[in-house]
């Protein structure tokens, strides 16, 4: 599968390397260009912008740092939201708030883009060894499309619902447990 991969930090870099080792084609972008070099050394193509990484991709995977990074890439200076193609699969692995995930879900739905929220649990070593756990949420068909990619870098995938923000709410511990 052809993947646009955004965010090659401590978690993103080993995830990208696992995807490359699984035979996927990656076009990679990172705010700090130096962080793309290990993936490029393993066969990834460097992209100058997030939109260039997405061009011609079947899916994009984002492992950006926080809400501010996602805001900058999708709605700020890069305006990636305007470049995404209908039918694209977006697997969102970075740590963001449930509120921003909901905003992204609405914007994606309005453009015919499948969003699967997939925050990861584990360390960079776990990522490098394919031992991450993933909390996934999204439409059933989208999660099914995402599963082979998620399996490239995780050993456990817990699907928690059809609304992408559910995954980040659980990841953030912001869902109250019902009391008996």
What are these regions, as identified by a protein language model?
Residues 20, 37-41, 71, 105-109, ...:
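Class I S-adenosyl-L-methionine
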Residues 50-115:
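Rossmann-fold NAD(P) dinucleotide-binding segment
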Residues 95-176:
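Rossmann-fold dinucleotide-binding core
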Residues 178-180:
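Active-site-proximal alpha-helical scaffold in enzymes
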């Amino acid at each position: 599968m052809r993947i646009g991969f955004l965010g090659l930090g401590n978690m993103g870099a080993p995830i990208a390397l696992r995807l490359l080792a699984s035979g996927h084609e990656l076009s990679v972008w990172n705010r700090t260009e130096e962080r793309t070099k290990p993936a490029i050394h393993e066969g990834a193509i460097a992209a100058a912008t997030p939109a260039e990484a997405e061009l011609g991709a079947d899916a994009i995977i984002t492992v950006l740092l926080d809400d501010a990074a996602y805001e900058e890439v999708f709605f700020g200076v890069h305006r990636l939201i305007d470049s995404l193609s209908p039918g694209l699969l977006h697997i969102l692995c970075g740590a963001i708030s449930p509120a921003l995930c909901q905003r992204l879900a609405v914007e994606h739905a309005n453009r015919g883009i499948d969003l699967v929220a997939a925050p990861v649990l584990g360390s960079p070593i776990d990522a490098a060894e394919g031992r991450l756990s993933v909390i996934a949420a999204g439409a059933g068909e989208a999660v099914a499309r995402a599963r082979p990619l998620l399996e490239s870098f995780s050993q456990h995938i817990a699907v928690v619902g059809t609304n992408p923000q559910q995954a980040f709410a659980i990841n953030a511990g912001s869902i109250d447990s019902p009391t008996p």
